[in-house]
Curated annotation (Swiss-Prot):
Gene, per the UniProt record: PT1
Organism: Pinus taeda (Loblolly pine)
GO molecular function: magnesium ion binding; metal ion binding; pinene synthase activity; potassium ion binding
Domain of life where this protein originates: Eukaryota
Catalytic reactions on record: (2E)-geranyl diphosphate = (1S,5S)-alpha-pinene + diphosphate
Protein name: (-)-alpha-pinene synthase, chloroplastic
Presequence extent in this chain: 1-48
Lineage: Eukaryota, Viridiplantae, Streptophyta, Embryophyta, Tracheophyta
Main location as per UniProt: plastid
Positions contributing to Mg(2+) 1 binding: 380, 384
Subcellular location: Plastid, Chloroplast
Coiled coil: none
Length: 629
């Protein structure tokens, strides 16, 4: 068990701000003393903190002994945010980018002409795929939606059950073109079967590759690996492709010299697809794109693509600065700095949002996601650690009243928590109402109520020491994971219409929402269970599985959960990309990418509690630092 110390709470724990209800009455603070959950647990101390954090108990001003996670402080103070500067908001940079966009569009269009530069029937397919893949990996594809569709329609026209060659008149198919085509077409919703890869196996059932690992051969296997990550449920050949290509590439990295190409391979192996957030991929690919020998001999000069990618990255960086300044003002104005019992990761959450949605018009999505996740974190730390069971029951009831007068029955520190939830959910609903043209508050309130009910159930398990069945814990945990409430209001603020039939395919009762919530619960528990258990929090996916299956070990449980995660990811891929869906990919993409963002945060550890290692690096690389032109 971690060391426990008893300390006095800081005097500013309770928010000094007076809150006013709708009638204009000032709410009078109510100081109450309530027995603490930890007392009932006979000294068992619990938190959902990272393994590197201790748990402290503290005696508050109202004489209640409280548990507090020993979280590190906010890493991004106001002075740092204010010190960020960027000249890329100037019109001249936008004008230069627009000229480059026009030139790249011309390059796309030239591929549609028989007399286009360097275009022949023997390489027209791979050229189109290379162009689409390049603009997507560089993070500039939003400018070329029409051109991308035209290019992929052309490729799909010549797709066969045996794949494609480099060009429409190629005599034989080849693995590189087919793998890149499978990946790219599938990501855009085209109906392409993974069985096409079986045609590239030898008689022994192995993928046919020469023993000599040339750069062209390695790149072919790299594209095979990238394709294998876009797998659907039940596709055995994709599992085989992933296993083969990952092993091949790891061996190749031991032999080839360090170069931009080896770095590209390393990045893809490190992040895969589900945790390789688009803006991070763009930042990394910018570094290798201009130096890659494949690109230097490619079908058009890379300078324009690279310059445009750098300009777009830095122009968005200037917008990020303004949005961060607004977010910090909101965070301070909400009274959040006085909530000393919880983690403050608003900048980190903003980073995740800006890594998956960097269209300028989606400021509401980015800021809404950061706000929603900040609220989720405050509630998480209050329900798991700081609040007593009686207090939490009062808070849960107050949320369902949805009126500032409900705070009269709450302890002082909860008044501030209640008001930030109340005000922020109302504000986000107003933004969503404007975007969707209808009232959204009641629908979104219901989502928040269900979320808090799930937290309340977990608080009861903590108080009693009960370890429920895996199924009971898992179903409740999918709700308490917070995926739904983190995604719902932000996606409704976008310019994408969400009529009722579409919303049902993204929010409940959709498989997309269920699977995204499942990944967050499963991956979160596999990263946090040891620390939770050391602090007395008994219930987790691991402990519940072991209870249901006597004789199993932690390793058995982890293997089972990791297998579940792999299956869930494939199910998520299908829900996003299934062909002939009545709901376009664009309507599902933000919710899907939120799942990727959370998954990224749990890639190495609990990156939300311990945000000063990999998460800090992500913030610096994608938000704080521009690229050099």
């Amino acid at each position: 068990m971690s060391p426990v110390s008893v300390i006095s709470l800081p005097s500013d724990l309770c928010l000094p701000t007076s809150f006013i209800d709708r009638s204009g009455r000032e709410l009078i603070p109510l100081h109450i003393t309530i027995p603490n959950v930890a007392m009932r647990r006979q000294g068992k101390l619990m938190t959902r903190a990272s393994m590197s954090m201790n748990l402290r108990t503290a005696v508050s001003d109202d004489a209640v002994i409280r548990r507090r996670g020993d979280f590190h402080s906010n890493l991004w103070d106001d002075d740092l945010i204010q010190s960020l500067s960027s000249p890329y908001g100037e019109p001249s940079y936008r004008e230069r980018a627009e000229r480059l966009i026009g030139e790249v569009k011309n390059s796309f269009n030239s591929m549609s002409n028989e007399d286009g530069e360097s275009i022949t029937p023997l390489d027209d397919l791979i050229q189109r795929l290379w162009m689409v893949d390049s603009v997507e990996r560089l993070g500039i594809d939003r400018h070329f939606k029409k051109e991308i569709k035209s290019a992929l329609d052309h490729v799909y026209r010549y797709w066969s059950e045996k794949g494609i060659g480099c060009g429409r008149e190629s005599v034989v198919t080849d693995l590189n073109s087919t793998a890149l085509g499978l990946r790219t077409l599938r990501l855009h919703g085209y109906d392409v079967s993974a069985d096409v890869l079986n045609h590239f196996k030898n008689q022994s059932g192995q993928f046919a590759c020469t023993l000599k690992q040339t750069e062209d051969q390695i790149r072919t296997v790299l594209n095979l690996y990238r394709a294998s990550l876009i797998a659907f449920p039940g596709e055995k050949v994709m599992d085989e492709a992933e296993s083969f290509s990952a092993k091949y590439l790891k061996e190749a990295l031991q032999k080839i010299p360090v170069s931009s190409f080896s770095r590209e391979i390393g990045d893809v192996l490190e992040y895969g697809w589900h945790t390789y957030l688009p803006r991070l991929e763009a930042r990394n690919y910018i570094d290798v794109f201009g130096q890659d020998t494949e690109n230097s001999k490619s079908y058009m000069k890379t300078e324009k693509l690279l310059e445009l990618a750098k300009l777009e990255f830095n122009i968005f960086h200037a917008l990020q600065k303004r949005e961060l300044e607004y977010l910090v003002r909101w965070w301070k104005g909400s009274g959040s700095p006085q909530m000393t019992f919880c983690r403050h990761r608003h900048v980190e959450y903003y980073t995740l949002a800006s890594c998956i949605a960097f269209e300028p018009q989606h400021s509401g999505f980015r800021l809404g996601f950061a706000k929603a996740c900040h609220i989720i974190t405050v509630l998480d730390d209050m329900y798991d650690t700081f609040g007593t069971l009686d207090e939490l029951e009062l808070f849960t009831s107050a949320i369902k009243r949805w009126d500032p007068s409900a705070t009269e029955c709450l302890p002082e520190y909860m008044k501030g928590v209640y008001m930030i939830v109340y005000n922020t959910v109302n504000e986000m609903s107003q933004e969503a109402d404007k975007a969707q043209g209808r009232d959204t508050l009641n629908y979104c309130r219901q989502a928040w109520e269900e979320y808090i009910d799930a937290y309340m159930q977990e608080a009861k398990w903590i108080a009693s020491g009960e370890v429920p069945t895996f199924e009971e814990y898992y179903e409740n945990g999918k709700v308490s994971s917070g995926h739904r409430v983190s995604a719902l209001q932000p996606i409704l603020t976008t310019d994408i219409p969400f009529p009722e039939h579409v919303l049902k395919e993204v929010d409940i009762p959709s498989q997309l929402n269920d699977l995204a919530s499942a990944i967050l619960r499963l991956r979160g528990d596999t990263r946090c269970y040891q620390a939770d258990r050391a602090r007395g929090e008994e219930a987790s996916c691991i402990s519940c599985y072991m209870k249901d299956n006597p004789g199993t070990t932690e390793e058995d449980a982890l293997n089972h959960l990791n297998a579940m995660i792999s299956d869930v990811i494939k199910g998520l891929n299908w829900e996003l990309l299934k062909p002939n869906s009545s709901v376009p990919i664009s309507a599902k993409k933000h919710a899907f990418d939120i799942s990727r963002a959370f998954h990224c945060g749990y890639k190495y550890r609990d990156g939300y509690s311990v945000a000063n290692i990999e998460t800090k690096s992500l913030v610096k690389r994608t938000v704080i630092d521009p690229v050099t032109l």
